[in-house]
Design a protein with these regions (language model features):
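N-terminal active-site segment of His-dependent metallophosphoesterases
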Residues: 1-71
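Extended active-site neighborhood of metal-dependent phosphoesterases/phosphodiesterases
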Residues: 66, 71-165, 173, 226, ...
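Conserved beta-sheet core of the metallophosphoesterase superfamily
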Residues: 77, 198-277
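Active-site neighborhood of phospho(di)ester-bond hydrolases with catalytic His/Asp-centered motifs
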Residues: 9-11, 53-59, 85-91, 140, ...
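A short C-terminal boundary segment appended to hydrolase-like catalytic domains
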Residues: 274-298
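Active-site-proximal loop/helix segment associated with metal-binding centers of metalloenzymes
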Residues: 17-27, 137-211
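Active-site environment of divalent metal-dependent phosphoester hydrolases
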Residues: 14-19, 62-67, 89-99, 144-150, ...
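Beta-strand-turn-beta hairpins that frame and shape the catalytic cleft
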Residues: 1-8, 128-139, 174-178, 245-251
């Protein structure tokens, strides 16, 4: 059994078929390109390579295309990480952008499952995986609520069937010493007053509606986590680096890992689980998005 387990936690990669293709989400200064190259740089980062597990909490691809999934798995394979990666889909992986329908069609879900299967990965949710003899992962699919408007495909829902099955899995593994739940959508977006008190930017109403699970699902998820003493819930979707405790449950969000921050760095979370004490330490790792230029010699 491992005495310490390290987890590199990435999210919202938004990989494209090639680096010339821009990300679908608009930004103030144009659409982001180069996500694939950024992911390659992240996979070469020494702390990530030394980790026991690499977790990607959704939005692996930008449009859910199989060509994007193939690019993801080829980069993972080239990095020698296929046997220690855990992946789950996000709303972009079950992609139905625009107002053409409210819920994803069966072929969209089938395409996401096929993308996971390309890497020989679990695709039926919830799934359970043991790591290092001490850690148990419980992965949940929340990318199944469809569009709430023509501007949003981001709403998350777990559903009662999956919640019941998650509860059954947690009961079966109730004696596992360390448990983590993986999900794409956030189980909590603070009210504006709470955000201001923390010194954070308050989320607008539409952001809170789109970036977190619906009220029933998020309360059930947090209740299950509390009852079965889950160490933390790891998520993505907000594109922010977050770490907070809600109702006694630690909730940690990874940033959009292939999107450079204001300093030009790519970011991911590095979690360390101390098996003997049960302590979970978490920090944000930063990787320059572009290699440093050699100094000019005069």
């Amino acid at each position: 059994m491992y005495r310490r387990i390290t987890i590199a936690h990435l999210s919202d990669l938004h990989l494209a078929a090639d680096d010339r293709t821009p990300r679908s989400e608009a930004r103030l200064f144009g659409r982001l390109r180069g996500m694939n190259g950024h992911f390659e740089r992240l996979l070469a980062d020494p702390p990530l390579r030394a980790s026991d597990l690499v977790v990607v909490t959704g939005d692996v691809t930008d449009h859910g295309d199989l060509a994007e999934w193939e690019r993801f798995w080829s980069l993972v394979e080239a990095g020698g990480l296929r046997d220690r990666i855990a992946v789950l889909p996000g709303n972009h992986d079950v992609c139905c952008l625009g107002s053409r329908r409210r819920r994803p069609r069966a072929e969209d879900w089938a395409r996401a499952r096929a993308g996971l299967a390309l890497g020989g990965h679990e695709w039926a949710f919830p799934w359970v995986r043991s790591v290092g003899g001490a850690l148990t992962l419980f992965a949940v699919d929340a990318a199944n609520a469809g569009n709430s408007s023509g501007l949003d495909n981001a709403v998350g829902r777990i559903g009662r069937r999956q919640l019941a099955e998650l509860g059954r899995c947690l009961l079966l593994f109730q004696d596992a010493p360390l448990k983590l739940i993986l999900i794409h959508h956030s189980p909590n977006i603070p009210h504006p007053a709470t955000s201001r008190r923390r010194g954070e930017r308050p989320a607008a109403f539409w952001e809170r509606r789109a970036l977190q699970l619906d009220p029933f699902d998020r309360r059930c998820l947090r209740l299950l986590a509390a009852v079965f003493r889950v160490k933390a819930i790891l998520h993505g979707h907000t594109h922010d680096s977050l770490d907070r405790t809600v109702g006694g449950i630690r909730i940690i969000g990874a940033p959009a890992s292939t999107e450079p921050d204001a300093a030009g760095c790519l970011r991911y979370k590095l979690h360390t689980l101390h098996v003997d004490s049960g302590r979970l330490a978490s920090r944000t790792e930063r990787v320059p998005a572009a290699p440093a230029r050699p100094a000019r010699v005069h």
